[in-house]
């Protein structure tokens, strides 16, 4: 089980042995992150036009307003990123389809704008080649099944455009799948929801079970013929939050072959932050506002006179990583930071430059470099290959 540190590894000098080992390791192996919301953050700066969004901020210099830019990514040793083509649940039907296509184009624009930094890839082999050439292998992940507007045709189009996974829900239920942060409506997946999972298997699109209800997780794993992923979730047993993964589901991953990519979101990893968020949710409900609407939540908290928000730490994230390893096994874990998808990240993991700090902490706790390499990206690449092998 997880034991507390006697100190904070992120406060130690950058020259410490563990951090040097972590940096050297991440120079040699692909570090893959399952979820980054930079495309939507750029839309917030530049508007819905993908060209203007991609050009709204110069990512070659440090951007204090962002968790992600190329100097930070270089320091963080990131080798492979699933860029989220996220669409808020407020978009429905045709507007959701339009928005997700715009977000796909934002990523394409970024790759064209920064060809010396990014390379658009769709396979594990292409990702490894991009890494060898000094580029960040860039893949796309759709967040929220509402973005296909109940159309298998739209799902197939997204895959044709390079989208490699789809999160079955976001914060609200779809008409065919239950979300973890909504009231149960379907008992997990409807028959159409099961058809969506089967079609994703067929076309080589990974089934992402972050955000969904445990009943949906179990149903999707039962239906899926290939490994599933959780692109950015943590462990319910460590912090009982509806966005996390119960132990019985983690225990299914060795049989399924899937990967739980542990996230850094403070409310998901820290019980103290989760309790603070419950107070915020209650205050918003009293004011007649919807907590699950991320835009409304951000505005509300600016003027809220509630208690100060507690801080999550690297130690909190380590607790989830080690619990997932204990229950699912070392071959079934990865990382999905959710950078630029939340306002702040834990101390020591504040932005995308900080990945080596996490690996230094794990090395200090006795992790082998081989196990760190599996967590970093080897497991995720295996799943990508298995999904593609079934589709072919």
Where in the sequence are the language-model features?
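Catalytic beta/alpha-barrel core
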Residues: 118-121, 205-212
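Surface-exposed cleft-lining segments at the edges of enzyme active sites
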Residues: 203-206, 308-309
């Amino acid at each position: 089980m997880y034991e507390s540190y006697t100190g904070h590894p992120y406060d130690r000098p950058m020259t410490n042995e563990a951090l040097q080992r972590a940096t050297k390791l991440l120079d040699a192996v692909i570090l893959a992150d399952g979820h980054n919301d930079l495309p939507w953050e750029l839309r917030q700066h530049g508007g819905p036009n993908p060209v203007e969004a991609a050009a709204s901020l110069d990512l070659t210099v440090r951007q204090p307003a962002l968790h992600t830019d190329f100097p930070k990514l270089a320091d963080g040793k990131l080798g492979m990123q699933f860029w989220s083509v996220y669409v808020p649940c407020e978009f429905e039907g045709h507007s959701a389809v339009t928005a997700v296509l715009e977000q796909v184009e934002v990523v394409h624009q970024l790759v064209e704008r920064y060809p010396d930094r990014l390379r658009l890839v769709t396979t594990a082999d292409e990702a490894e080649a991009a890494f060898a050439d000094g580029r960040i292998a860039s893949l796309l992940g759709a967040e929220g099944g509402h973005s296909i507007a109940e159309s298998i045709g739209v799902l197939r189009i997204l895959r044709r455009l390079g989208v490699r996974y789809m999160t079955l829900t976001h914060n609200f239920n779809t008409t065919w799948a239950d979300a973890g942060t909504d009231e149960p409506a379907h008992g997990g997946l409807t028959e159409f929801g099961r058809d969506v999972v089967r079609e994703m298997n067929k076309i080589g699109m990974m089934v992402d079970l972050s955000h969904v209800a445990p009943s949906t997780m179990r149903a999707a794993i039962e239906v899926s013929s290939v490994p599933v992923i959780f692109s950015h979730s943590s462990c319910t047993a460590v912090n009982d939050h509806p966005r996390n993964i119960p132990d019985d589901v983690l225990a299914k991953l060795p049989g399924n072959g899937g990967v739980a990519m542990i996230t850094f979101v403070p409310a998901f990893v820290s019980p103290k932050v989760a309790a603070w968020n419950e107070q915020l949710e209650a205050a918003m409900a009293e004011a007649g506002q919807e907590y699950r609407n991320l835009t409304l939540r951000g505005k509300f908290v600016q003027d809220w006179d509630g208690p100060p928000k507690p801080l999550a730490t690297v130690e909190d994230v380590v607790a989830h990583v080690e619990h997932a390893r204990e229950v699912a096994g070392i071959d079934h874990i990865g990382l999905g930071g959710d950078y630029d998808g939340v306002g702040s990240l834990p101390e020591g993991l504040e932005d995308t430059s900080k990945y080596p700090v996490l690996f230094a902490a794990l090395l200090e706790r006795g992790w082998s470099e081989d196990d760190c390499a599996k967590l970093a990206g080897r497991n995720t690449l295996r799943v990508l290959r298995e999904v593609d092998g079934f589709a072919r």
